[in-house]
UniProtKB/Swiss-Prot annotation:
Swiss-Prot/TrEMBL GO biological process terms: translation
Pfam family, one: Ribosomal_L27A
Gene this chain is encoded by: rplO
Family annotation (NCBIfam families): rplO_bact
Subunit structure comment from the entry: Part of the 50S ribosomal subunit.
GO MF, any single term: rRNA binding
Protein family membership: Belongs to the universal ribosomal protein uL15 family.
Protein name (record): Large ribosomal subunit protein uL15
Job of this protein: Binds to the 23S rRNA.
Single GO cellular component term: cytosolic large ribosomal subunit
Length: 144
């Protein structure tokens, strides 16, 4: 065996069939599409179901998007334990600590988990249980 005699194994490399290139090519004339009809012609548009009422028109339209909706970044109490005792927790400090990814319309503190440190928490909204838990731990809440 010599390098110049190397050949790919039989059947591993085949040329692609170029369709519609004359009758003697084997895939000329109808190009493997059979005779006439919708499938022999161009593509049907997206969502077309052969004349049947398409799914996107059978299903009713529902609801709307409220342009005035405010979306708050949610923070639970157990996430606040990363801050030092007596620290002031603001939306900026939460962003810096990586607890929230973006500020959105503001920050809402919820009462899931336990808080073990005395903190001053400044946020746009608080749940009742969060306020009780923060004050029970000796901290303060402030709506900004």
């Amino acid at each position: 065996m010599k390098l110049n005699e190397l050949m790919p194994s039989e059947g591993s490399r085949t040329n692609r069939k170029r369709i519609g290139r004359g009758t003697s090519s084997g895939t000329g004339k109808t190009a493997g599409r059979g005779q006439k009809g919708q499938k022999a012609r161009g593509k049907v548009r997206l969502g077309f179901e052969g004349g049947q009422m398409p799914l996107y028109r059978r299903i009713p339209k529902r609801g709307f998007t409220n342009i005035n909706r405010k979306e708050f970044a949610i923070v639970n109490l157990d996430a606040l334990n990363v801050f030092d005792e007596g620290a002031e927790v603001t939306p900026e400090s939460l962003l810096k600590a990586g607890i929230i990814s973006k500020q959105l319309s503001g920050v809402k503190v919820l009462g899931n988990g336990e808080i073990t440190k005395k903190l001053t928490v400044k946020a746009n909204k608080f749940s009742e249980s969060a306020v009780k838990a923060i004050e029970a731990a000796g901290g303060k809440t402030e709506v900004i």
